[in-house]
């Protein structure tokens, strides 16, 4: 081992030790999924032949995060079926580890206003998710007046829109949507998964769009789904992910970033602990205040989630 390699390894080890030795900050996980594979009629996701086809319940999540100081979670709906909004609310009502849900409704649907009014009566219903999911065409929909009217209703209700699965086109569409509905509270999920294209001009334009979004009030990003496959392998070293995380942090700063695991979908790329370790090692050296913002404070502003347990923090 040469001197440069030794110093690099020592620095990484020092960062890891410092992060793990820092005061335990309470964590609100803003991105988990709940489903029951034994439900009559089956479920739309995950697929039966996949590695995560095992029921994901609040009890299982609570057991999974024991000892990690994860004190609450927001469920992000993983089904396009209308009735599953109520199913999740019923499941969450029984376990205070769940602080709220982002449901699945179609803003352009004829009954959207009625459906939104129904679910908004439940304080655990924090908003809806719409984006690159369930074969939906966000670009086309975001040009439809009826869709825009639905998003305006969402904003008027003081609820949040979560986007799904970022692309350069989706980022451009979200910026345009924010222009049309300035009071919309927007959370862009899984931003570390945004892959650059082969076109440098497209990437430059996307960077400009992100910087524009970062200037708008009520825009947040999830530093979630961080672990990713590269050439068939999933790196577990924080240093590998640092350049992409640095870019996000440089654009959005400490006040707009949120923690989310994407559990159990994250199990495709590593354990819950492995994913958490990477973001803890990245954020903890930034200091207590910045880490608290990432792990729980910003999530209050983004979601207005419900404190249901004494261990859950409140600003």
Task: Give the label of every model feature segment.
Residues 81-169, 175-176, 222-228, 233-235:
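Active-site gating/metal-coordination segments in enzymes
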Residues 83-97, 187, 241-250, 272-282:
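Short, electropositive alpha-helical surface patch
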Residues 58-62, 85, 89, 113-117, ...:
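Generic structural signal for well-ordered alpha-helices
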Residues 32, 78, 191, 262-263:
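Active-site metal-binding loops of divalent metal-dependent hydrolases
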Residues 5-20, 25-30, 54-72, 246-247, ...:
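Mid-to-C-terminal alpha-helical segments outside catalytic/metal-binding sites
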């Amino acid at each position: 081992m040469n001197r440069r390699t030794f110093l690099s390894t020592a620095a990484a080890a020092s960062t890891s030790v410092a992060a793990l030795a820092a005061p335990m900050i309470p964590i609100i996980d803003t991105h988990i999924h709940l489903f029951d594979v034994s439900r009559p009629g089956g479920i739309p996701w995950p697929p039966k032949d996949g590695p995560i086809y095992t029921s994901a319940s609040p009890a299982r999540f609570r057991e999974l995060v024991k000892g990690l100081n994860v004190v609450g979670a927001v469920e992000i709906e993983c089904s396009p079926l209308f009735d599953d909004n109520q199913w999740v609310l019923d499941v969450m009502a029984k376990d205070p580890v769940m602080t709220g849900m982002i449901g699945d409704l179609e803003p352009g649907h004829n009954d959207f206003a009625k459906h939104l009014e129904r679910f908004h009566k439940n304080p655990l219903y924090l908003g809806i998710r719409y984006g690159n999911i369930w074969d939906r065409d966000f670009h086309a929909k975001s040009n439809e007046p009826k869709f825009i009217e639905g998003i305006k209703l969402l904003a008027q209700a003081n609820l949040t829109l979560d986007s799904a699965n970022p692309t350069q086109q989706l980022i451009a569409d979200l910026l345009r949507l924010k222009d049309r509905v300035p009071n919309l509270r927007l959370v862009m999920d899984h931003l570390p998964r945004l892959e650059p294209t082969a076109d440098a001009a497209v990437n430059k334009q996307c960077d400009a769009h992100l910087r524009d979004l970062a200037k708008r009030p009520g825009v947040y990003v999830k530093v979630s789904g961080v672990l990713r496959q590269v050439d068939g392998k999933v790196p577990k070293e924080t240093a590998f992910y640092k350049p992409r995380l640095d870019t996000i942090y440089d654009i959005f700063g400490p006040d707009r970033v949120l923690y989310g695991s994407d559990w159990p979908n994250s199990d495709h790329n590593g354990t819950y602990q492995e994913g958490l370790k990477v973001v803890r090692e990245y954020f903890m050296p930034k200091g207590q205040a910045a880490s608290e913002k990432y792990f729980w404070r910003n999530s209050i502003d983004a979601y207005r989630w419900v404190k249901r347990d004494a261990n859950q923090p409140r600003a």
